């Protein structure tokens, strides 16, 4: 392949009709100037945090709602506004945002908070290696170095609690009793209301001093959000009239997920740009929907536990053998043989039945209970993804290299 060929490709895409004015406006990380349909939540949060401006410690807040209901962007919006107005009143405020999906251990959360003040304190905690008690002592020291209010936002707090327990919350919600100059307030954000069941009652009462609920958006509200972003994201006249309503309607089916709506609009624009189209049409939205679903399914399969991956491969082998739909017993038999083949201790049939239900809930397989008349009821299992897709994902998973070498004969012997 010569350089001229590549040059011509780059030139072609560079000089194609420009769809986007500012694509970043459609990213999840972008904080807009206005937040449609979240005035009630903004006012609630402002009311909870306003004591800061009077020199008083605000309550801890627990914020919850499903994915894409505007929790994170609203918290960022309100805390950024608080920081601006606090300067006017000469009240020092620090806001520390921690994504607990990534920073998911007690040690790393504490280190993250300490390192927020590294330029001021000269203290930097490594990602591993120090005793946790020492990190906590450093945290208290750097926060309490001067009079100020520190608001710690723990986003996806449920991920942290499920992985590492609630000791860190116990410490942070009581830290003010150990400080002399600074005051700390916690904002916990969760997609999962049930996660409160994991908390010690004392932690729960401290964290949930105030609660703010974010309900799902409906299709009309999603349309307003997209219209607002589209003005800044796209060049004038490039969106067909039906594009935004379709993105909103599709995302409304996904429990009113604004993130999904923004992704649909962005990916539809990217597809149109790649095609060299002068406009984004509804056809591009449907293509975007298909691409996002494929990407989501790939991510779901990649993050399955090992036994679920082996179980899925058993169903793949049955599919390649022309034996789907299969019942639970047939699937378990092949799964057990695979485990024996790769020296993995098999789970019980009852546990595998639970894993089948989980794969069904994730949409990777379809496990439908059907009546066989006088023979009773049985579960018929089918694949919802192609064997090629599963194998392609497994090809990059070092744990499953051995599994990929296995095929199955018509007599269900593994080869």
Curated annotation (Swiss-Prot):
Any one GO molecular function term: ATP hydrolysis activity
CDD domains xref list: AAA (cd00009), Cdc6_C (cd08768), HLD_clamp_RarA (cd18139)
A biological-process GO annotation: DNA replication
Binding annotation for ATP: 69-73, 217, 229
Keywords, comma-separated and alphabetical: ATP-binding, DNA replication, Nucleotide-binding
Protein role: Involved in regulation of DNA replication.
HAMAP family: ORC1_type_DNA_replic_protein
UniProt family annotation: Belongs to the CDC6/cdc18 family.
Protein name (record): ORC1-type DNA replication protein
Organism (species): Thermococcus onnurineus (strain NA1)
